[in-house]
């Protein structure tokens, strides 16, 4: 036997390589690739495809977020369907210095500052509407009235309770002052701090309305006046003096000194009383005794008998338009803070205004009333109503001796002011403010394109830019010289205007098509109803004809006789008519008979 030399197992011959290559090509031709048999290769391909898919999803998510952030800076124009950039809010600059300072404050960034609603919520949580100040103010007069009938040994306990109440009031005032300081530290309310200082510097004129509606609890004789008027009535002053003597005899010297020192204590909100009740409070004597009942009754009679005139009201800051010009905001809200808000209808200014000028008709709005106030004819119409004529029997008494000396001077000033102009309502300001408001109202009616064209000083109106034909528009543009911003704005206005006109025409055509389709549908409904009526009428006619035919059939059949003269039975025979009009009697179970009628 011949020994064949085999190649080493690690080496492959050229024939083997060719055979493997042929078999590989055959597998490829049959659609079988290497991945079918190689599991690791299939795993790699699967991982690669998975990574590509995740990367694609990540890119899509990023693109969606970018589109969302991009469209958040634009707003959709409902007329043209375009996305327009959102214009930032512009602060309107007015002529008054107060508004300039307020606009400067408004430009301060507010990331760390509190908002106005948060401040009001903090104020409401800290101090509720029914606070302890009112309850203490109600409790103190009751103790003061009951102290007349207490024994001397109880005066010390009463004095201690009053001192505790005063300490509570002082602590509440300190807390209120701290809260107001925190509110004034907010950038939004910086303008209110300066205005509050200006109001604190000016001396307030005593207002009869404030005196009649509000009493300070620290002044002892206010509550005693009302109680004495109710109980004593029209008794003489000697009874009151006797009452005071008996009261002073009850108390010991120590208690009386403590009580008089308590009444004449200068720390019990004397600024508040001196500011608002200086015309009605008698100056305390050097001895520190209580005011006499004669002075009290005299001041009360002067208060009740005195009449309120328009010139007296004009001296008050709330009714004088000159004082109202100094402040930009209306100090009218219940919380003491107001930012460019109109006065409420429940405020005292409106009540006095309605009593002096008369209530406006119910059909008028606020804007119409402002236009009437600014019109020159309104002064002549409202002039006679501003100063009501007094009857000859009326007696005008001055509120105080100092005011009594200056009464003729104030009357002449009041007449001069009524001849010149009627004071405007407390909430509204004079003619310059209304003019600015009127111009801002006119600017509010302008469109966005008109405002931009006005800002860039474009000499053509927006309607002309949009509606002119192409040749006329090019000729108009060639006559003027424009910069890049003006040209871009004019082209943008014309493009969007044409798009708007095209959209309007498209909507018009759609509406016309809808109306035409509605008309066609209405015609079809009418025709359908007409056909239904005709069908019903035809059915009724057919039913009538069938009934008449059956009646005629029975009549003819009853007239037929056989050879014996007997009538034919309807169950055995029937009548049939041919096309030529002949009628035959045909038996039902047999062939047609030859008898002819």
Curated annotation (Swiss-Prot):
Heterodimer; heterodimerizes with small Maf proteins. Interacts (via the bZIP domain) with MAFG and MAFK; required for binding to antioxidant response elements (AREs) on DNA. Interacts with KEAP1; the interaction is direct and promotes ubiquitination by the BCR(KEAP1) E3 ubiquitin ligase complex. Forms a ternary complex with PGAM5 and KEAP1. Interacts with EEF1D at heat shock promoter elements (HSE). Interacts via its leucine-zipper domain with the coiled-coil domain of PMF1. Interacts with CHD6; involved in activation of the transcription. Ubiquitinated in the cytoplasm by the BCR(KEAP1) E3 ubiquitin ligase complex leading to its degradation. In response to oxidative stress, electrophile metabolites, such as sulforaphane, modify KEAP1, leading to inhibit activity of the BCR(KEAP1) complex, promoting NFE2L2/NRF2 nuclear accumulation and activity. In response to autophagy, the BCR(KEAP1) complex is inactivated. Phosphorylated by EIF2AK3/PERK following unfolded protein response (UPR), promoting dissociation from its cytoplasmic inhibitor KEAP1, followed by its translocation into the nucleus. Phosphorylation of Ser-40 by PKC in response to oxidative stress dissociates NFE2L2 from its cytoplasmic inhibitor KEAP1, promoting its translocation into the nucleus. One of its GO terms (cellular component) is cytoplasm. Residues 489-552 form the bZIP domain. GO terms for molecular function: DNA binding; DNA-binding transcription activator activity, RNA polymerase II-specific; DNA-binding transcription factor activity; molecular condensate scaffold activity; protein domain specific binding; RNA polymerase II cis-regulatory region sequence-specific DNA binding; RNA polymerase II-specific DNA-binding transcription factor binding; sequence-specific DNA binding. Widely expressed. Highest expression in liver, skeletal muscle, luminal cells of the stomach and intestine, lining of the bronchi and alveoli, and in renal tubules; followed by heart, spleen, testis and brain. Changing residue 30 to A: Abolished ubiquitination and degradation by the BCR(KEAP1) complex in the cytoplasm. The modification N6-acetyllysine is found at residues 588, 591. Transcription factor that plays a key role in the response to oxidative stress: binds to antioxidant response (ARE) elements present in the promoter region of many cytoprotective genes, such as phase 2 detoxifying enzymes, and promotes their expression, thereby neutralizing reactive electrophiles. In normal conditions, ubiquitinated and degraded in the cytoplasm by the BCR(KEAP1) complex. Residues 514-521 are annotated as: Leucine-zipper. Belongs to the bZIP family. CNC subfamily. Gene3D superfamilies: Transcription factor, Skn-1-like, DNA-binding domain. The ETGE motif, and to a lower extent the DLG motif, mediate interaction with KEAP1. Disruption phenotype: Mice are viable and fertile but have low and uninducible phase 2 detoxifying enzymes, are much more susceptible to carcinogens and the toxicity of oxygen and electrophiles and cannot be protected by inducers. Mutant mice show an increased mortality during LPS and cecal ligation and puncture-induced septic shock compared to wild-types. They show greater pulmonary inflammation and greater TNF secretion upon LPS administration. Mice lacking both Nfe2l2/Nrf2 and Keap1 reverse the hyperkeratosis phenotype observed in Keap1 knockout: mice and are healthy and viable in normal conditions. CDD domains: bZIP_NFE2-like (cd14720). Residues 327-440, 563-597 are annotated as: Disordered. Glycans are attached at residues 454, 464, 479, 491, 561, 566. Residues 491-510 are annotated as: Basic motif. Keywords: Acetylation, Activator, Cytoplasm, DNA-binding, Glycation, Glycoprotein, Nucleus, Phosphoprotein, Transcription, Transcription regulation, Ubl conjugation. A motif (ETGE motif) lies at residues 79-82. A motif (DLG motif) lies at residues 29-31. It comes from Mus musculus (Mouse). InterPro entries: bZIP, bZIP_Maf, bZIP_sf, NFE2-like, TF_DNA-bd_sf. The keyword NADP does not apply. This is Nuclear factor erythroid 2-related factor 2. It comes from the Eukaryota.
């Amino acid at each position: 036997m011949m020994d064949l030399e085999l190649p080493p197992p690690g080496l492959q011959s050229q024939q083997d390589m060719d055979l493997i290559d042929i078999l590989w090509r055959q597998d490829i031709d049959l659609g079988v690739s290497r991945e079918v048999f190689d599991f690791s290769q299939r795993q790699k391909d699967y991982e690669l495809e998975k990574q590509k898919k995740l990367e694609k999803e990540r890119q899509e998510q990023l693109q969606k977020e970018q589109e969302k952030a991009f469209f958040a800076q634009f707003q959709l124009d409902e007329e043209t369907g375009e996305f327009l950039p959102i214009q930032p809010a512009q602060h309107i600059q007015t002529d008054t210095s107060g508004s300039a300072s307020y606009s400067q404050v408004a430009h301060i960034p507010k990331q760390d500052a509190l908002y106005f609603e948060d401040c009001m919520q903090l104020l409401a949580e800290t101090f509720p509407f029914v606070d302890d100040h009112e309850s203490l103010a109600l409790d103190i007069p009751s103790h003061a009235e009951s102290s007349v009938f207490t024994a001397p040994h109880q005066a010390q306990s009463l004095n201690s309770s009053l001192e505790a109440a005063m300490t509570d009031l002082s602590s509440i005032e300190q807390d209120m002052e701290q809260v107001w300081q925190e509110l004034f530290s907010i950038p939004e309310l910086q303008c209110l701090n300066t205005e509050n200082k200006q109001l604190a510097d000016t001396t307030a004129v005593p207002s009869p309305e404030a005196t009649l509606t509000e009493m300070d609890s620290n002044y002892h004789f206010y509550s005693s006046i009302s109680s004495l008027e109710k109980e004593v009535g029209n008794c003489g002053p000697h009874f009151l003096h006797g009452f005071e003597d008996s009261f002073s005899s009850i108390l010991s010297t120590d208690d009386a000194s403590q009580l008089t020192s308590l009444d004449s204590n200068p720390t019990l909100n004397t600024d508040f009383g001196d500011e608002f009740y200086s015309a009605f409070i008698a100056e305390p004597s050097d001895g520190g005794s209580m005011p006499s009942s004669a002075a009290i009754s005299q001041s009360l009679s002067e208060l009740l008998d005195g009449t309120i005139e328009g010139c007296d009201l004009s001296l008050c800051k709330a009714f004088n338009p000159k004082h109202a010009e100094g402040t930009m905001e209306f100090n009218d809200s219940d919380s003491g803070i107001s930012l460019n808000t109109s006065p409420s209808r429940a405020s005292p200014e409106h009540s006095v205004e309605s009593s002096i000028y008369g209530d406006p008709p119910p059909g008028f709005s606020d804007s119409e009333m402002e236009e009437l106030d600014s019109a020159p004819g309104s002064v002549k119409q409202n002039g006679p109503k501003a100063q009501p004529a007094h009857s000859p029997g009326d007696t005008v008494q001055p509120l105080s001796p100092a005011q009594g000396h200056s009464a003729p001077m104030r009357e002449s000033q009041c007449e001069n002011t009524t001849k010149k102009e009627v004071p405007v309502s407390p909430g509204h300001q004079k003619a310059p403010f209304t003019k600015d408001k009127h111009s801002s109202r006119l600017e509010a009616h302008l469109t966005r394109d008109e405002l931009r064209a006005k800002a860039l000083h474009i000499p053509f109106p927006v309607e002309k830019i949009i509606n002119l034909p192409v040749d006329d528009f090019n000729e108009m543009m060639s006559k003027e010289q424009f910069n890049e911003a003006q040209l871009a704005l004019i082209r943008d206005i014309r493009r969007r205007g044409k798009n708007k006109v095209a959209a309007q025409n498209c909507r018009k055509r759609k509406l016309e098509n809808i109306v035409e389709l509605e008309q066609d549908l209405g015609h079809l409904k009418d025709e359908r109803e007409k056909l239904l009526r005709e069908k019903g009428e035809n059915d009724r006619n057919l039913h009538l004809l069938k009934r008449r035919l059956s009646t005629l059939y029975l009549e003819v059949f009853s007239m037929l006789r056989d050879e014996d003269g007997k009538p034919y039975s309807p169950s055995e025979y029937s009548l049939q008519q041919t096309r030529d009009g002949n009628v035959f009697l045909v038996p039902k179970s047999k062939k047609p008979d030859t008898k002819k009628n």
